[in-house]
Design a protein with these regions (language model features):
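Surface-exposed helix-capping loop/turn segments at secondary-structure junctions
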Residues: 47-50, 87, 146-151
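Short secondary-structure junctions
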Residues: 86-93
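Sequence-level detector for tyrosine residue identity
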Residues: 26, 30, 63-64, 87, ...
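Active-site/substrate-binding loop(s) of hydrolase catalytic cores
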Residues: 1-75, 79, 84, 115-129
Length: 151
């Protein structure tokens, strides 16, 4: 996509990352400059979700914060998801903390948003890890659905 890292093209301090086309971390000429980003944001705006999970690889971490903003129950929900999956709960730092889908969702809607960094090891993750990664992240997704339904 023209050297734009879609992970940093969302309107949430997207300009804080790399400022020219690059294999990674370039946020684009402007927020939502890429059709993939616009497709996601238009869909989310239309559907008005209560919570958002953005899955990336890798790190076995759950991020819940954007620029000091969190949804009302974000920390508590992140801890529950971490308990289910054995992932760590983290606040992103550096360029990882800007321009992402979760960041935009928190900024735009003030609701719980999470980035789940799946698996560890090489990138991309090998197919041999599929069952393990699926099991861990199915638990995270089920926990999130439970929180949306009952809280």
């Amino acid at each position: 996509s023209r050297g734009v890292d879609i992970n940093h093209n969302f309107d949430a301090k997207w300009q804080m990352v790399v400022d020219k086309p690059s294999p990674s971390k370039y946020g684009g000429e402007y927020a939502e400059s890429e059709p993939e980003t616009r497709a996601i944001t238009e869909f989310v705006r239309k559907e008005q979700f209560d919570m958002l999970l953005a899955f990336h690889s890798q790190g076995r971490e759950i991020y819940y914060d954007f620029d000091g903003m969190t949804g009302e129950n974000s920390v508590e929900i992140a801890k529950k998801m971490a308990e289910e999956s054995r992932y760590a709960v983290c606040i992103p730092t550096g360029t990882a903390s800007y321009g992402g889908c979760k960041d935009w969702f928190i900024k735009e809607f003030g609701k719980e948003g999470f980035t789940v960094e799946i698996g560890t090891g090489q990138n991309p993750l090998p197919m041999s890890m599929l069952d393990e990664v699926y099991d861990e992240n199915a638990k995270i997704a089920l926990c999130a659905m439970h929180e949306c339904a009952y809280n």
